């Protein structure tokens, strides 16, 4: 994300464009991709001289939409076809029964959805928003577009051609007045917010620069520079203490998987399927490297403030800052900003290359950087960035003539985004001995090789892997999309979760165990009214990555748990979870059809959930051994669709 285009509440005008030429770009985003799209659309509109506002949907009142010439919606799908959290208030306001079919008459809009076709409800959020806008009288002025996470070129594969078509539409339908041309791509749009040194008195305060090349985790840094002590004022966050960070795969195993236990003092409630988000930090070494490359040594340890570029605008006209809560950071230096908030190890988007091309005078570098922004070179862009996972820091090392003004850091670098992890604890595992909340996570540390010699590491999991017990870190609790009811927890269920996908399923199993134990305490000697649960687990090797094996044995009798396993590398013929489902098709048919059970699929997106869905369809066709008429292919597919509609088939993949 670039902070340069982010704007505040609709209704606050930006720089004036031609009369009757305004654009509102709104987004619903869970991980930031829809916000990236919104900001790129906003930049396009600004170059076409639209007075442009960008905002998350929850900050918008539906009745304000008609005051803009055009409105663009960028919406991701999360959970079971849901809108992201920062769009749900807006969505609920559109669902009020009292709204007449003319409520949004005069609103001219288009939309772009972001989804993952491995989910049954692909781009569901954007599609249902589109339909509701039409129901309320809004006019679609340009056909919406859809991005698919599974596309070979990622979201860019469909977004770039959609954006090019939208630009042509705007120029055709909203032509510029004579003598006015679009702002060329090689002309920099001014950032909305900039950094500045605090007044001379504050800047002269003793802020001693650390030896940034020392040890990052336990080195002699001020607290705010250390990875293991997190006191950032992040919105809606909790400060958690790390109790355990244990590797649960052998050192010889190809993958480092960690079992984390975190605690907070407050007795916070959560349910199976909920997620924790963790906001990582950059290492002091990486930040020092950037400071030296950019020549920011003089400013690095001085106190800075983030201020609007145009200080003449009134408070209610100010755009929203790219980073929130900085005003509550008591002594913010440029170095602290880089360590705590700016993602210098992200894989950049095309807009980053466009931004840094303005900061070099070396024509060969400028030309090369601009080539990466050209849609005609999309494959080359992917070959340079996404496929080898080349980071911003590495790119700046290679294009060493780029010198970004420190004042523009927040409008050039993306913001560090929180990463989501499914909570693996439930039932009695949710509380500490002193009444606080306890969270368990199962996290695969991202570490791999590409064509680049240096090993690739995930920004967040590298941060997590370096934390030791006793560390504090910022977390946020978010409601998940599985929404398993008590009836489903104690009823017939089939849980499918290879690898770390078992984490949210473990939460469900321990929750079921707590329900059973509570019933037994209240009804001694009476069998609890529960149905069987089948867990289908997959890994590479039973001896290396059969997570929580001892627990499954412990819970088997208590909650009527049956575990089916598929270890792909323990025999010559590879076996996956879908193969185990196929081998047990009669059992599956009985549980899901005859008993009316529910299915929960968790784990990696892509082939696994699609293969599971196909195998379940086959089970409905061939698993009925009761002698009655078997399902046809169409009937089996329809039955599975019916399960989705009634909440009996849910998927949470990543």
From Swiss-Prot:
Cofactor: FAD; FMN
Residues reported to bind FMN: 29-34, 76-79, 114-123
Domain FAD-binding FR-type, residue spans: 235-485
Biased composition range(s): Low complexity: 1-10
Chain positions recorded as NADP(+) binding sites: 500, 568-569, 574-578
Organism superkingdom: Eukaryota
Record-linked SUPFAM superfamilies: Ferredoxin reductase-like, C-terminal NADP-linked domain (SSF52343), Flavoproteins (SSF52218), Riboflavin synthase domain-like (SSF63380)
Entry keyword set: Cytoplasm, FAD, Flavoprotein, FMN, Mitochondrion, NADP, Oxidoreductase
Chain ranges of the Flavodoxin-like domain: 23-167
Binding site for FAD: 389, 419-422, 458-461, 654
Region (Disordered): 1-22
An example Gene Ontology CC term for this record: cytosolic [4Fe-4S] assembly targeting complex
GO molecular function terms noted in the UniProt entry: flavin adenine dinucleotide binding; FMN binding; NADP binding; NADPH-hemoprotein reductase activity; oxidoreductase activity
InterPro entries: CysJ-like_FAD-binding, FAD-bd_FR_type, Flavdoxin-like, Flavodoxin/NO_synth, Flavoprot_Pyr_Nucl_cyt_Rdtase, Flavoprotein-like_sf, FNR_nucleotide-bd, NADPH_Cyt_P450_Rdtase_alpha
EC number: 1.18.1.-
Entries under PROSITE patterns matching the protein: FAD_FR (PS51384), FLAVODOXIN_LIKE (PS50902)
Cellular compartment(s): Cytoplasm; Mitochondrion
Family: Belongs to the NADPH-dependent diflavin oxidoreductase NDOR1 family.
Name the record gives this protein: NADPH-dependent diflavin oxidoreductase 1
Organism listed in the record: Emericella nidulans (strain FGSC A4 / ATCC 38163 / CBS 112.46 / NRRL 194 / M139) (Aspergillus nidulans)
